[in-house]
């Protein structure tokens, strides 16, 4: 049976506007793959070659979300975590399917399964593929004052730049992303800086930063190995990608503007509720409760890159006129 890859809204494979991948590939549909293995040691991984439908749609999905650095981003390898390559891996696939069915029954037939990127080092992703997520992975979000609750954080597939900016480069200049299937069920909004670590009630299954346009999926530790299924590893190079200490990219060659000036300009372009969220985050930064990179992260999440870029551009132009 030929492998088939579709988009979640059942449109053409070339249409990635909604940023989601619907996986209708049968587990044994491994056409156009190399069984020579990937750079990772897990026996469950197979290397997908150019021309393989899964390889091509994942490559397109990642690059389409990389924004200004997409033209300088090179996909090196894409490896599939195959259920046909080991009893344990097969069991994880079956368990994920059972949990999908259970959540679907809970919510009238829709388990709300999405794809999300998880950023980590090569060793971290190797460990997750082999053993699953652990408290160590939860811990890095627990110590981040800007995170949306304490759990495993993933980024929607359409927001690959946000995920890529949190990757670590290895000695060969490679970065790694883990594309996972994620059972969201019914999510609830989790505010930045929240220390929530489990659903607020039995009604909810997961967390998001925004119900309508989420940039963060939060899976609680109690569900991290039942509601997240690691599916593909992507290794890539992106020389223009800039990663701050906290894991968020800055735009190349951006003109400088102080936070105080940026806050003043944002206040004329944003609604009060979003502006108040940025003000509270900025206040935490001034009190040294959060790091600079965490403030930048929150500004980008709330205001959006397009608005920030326009404000900085206008600020630069005004300075030219003044000078």
From Swiss-Prot:
Positions of the RST domain: 250-321
Predominant localisation class: nucleus
Keyword Nucleus annotated: yes
Cellular compartments annotated: Nucleus
GO cellular component, one term: nucleus
Induction field: By salt stress and light.
GO MF term set: NAD+ poly-ADP-ribosyltransferase activity
Alphabetically ordered keywords of this record: Developmental protein, Nucleus, Stress response
Coiled-coil spans in chain: none
A Pfam family annotated for this UniProt entry: RST
Domain PARP catalytic: 31-257
Function: Probable inactive ADP-ribosyltransferase that may be involved in stress and developmental responses.
Subunit structure, as described in the record: Interacts with STO.
Name the UniProt record assigns to this protein: Probable inactive poly [ADP-ribose] polymerase SRO2
